Amino acid sequence: MDPREKTACFTGHRPEKLFPSDTETAAQVLEIRRSLHARILQAVDDGYTTFLCGMAQGVDLWAGDMVLSLQESVRQLKLVAVLPYPASVRGWPPEWQRSYLRVLKFCTEAVLICPGYQPDCYHQRNRYMVDHASRLIGVWREGCPGGTQYTVQYAEKKGLELDLILLP
């Protein structure tokens, strides 16, 4: 069996793009997280056992945390960190750095895409995840340019099943 059949990957905007007008509320974050958790649970119910996480602030790290919490009851789940380059967290707010390190510590495996920063290292990371999965789980504001839009479009082109939370 092709391992991609049981592998899903994540994409989603960073916090500042999730709530572009600084109107983030705890209720909005909770609703997105609930929807994301439901989609991960559905993937597990559908037989997915490996989850690829790009380890970015926001949706990626939320999803990574959720998979790790599910590992307590579903032992065969694997979380794979797909890192664009080693120092990708430099300059992040401390709370996101802590979240990154916590998730990375408990990942089953880590894949390093580039040995150092390169202009397209984030796109390379996103392509790697799509090329190694059969389902994309994400949070997307359609028309919002950036890595999430690129990843959704690339996944469509590659024929992945899309399970997206669409934001207004």
Located regions from the model:
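Acidic/glycine-enriched connector segments
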Residues: M1-P168
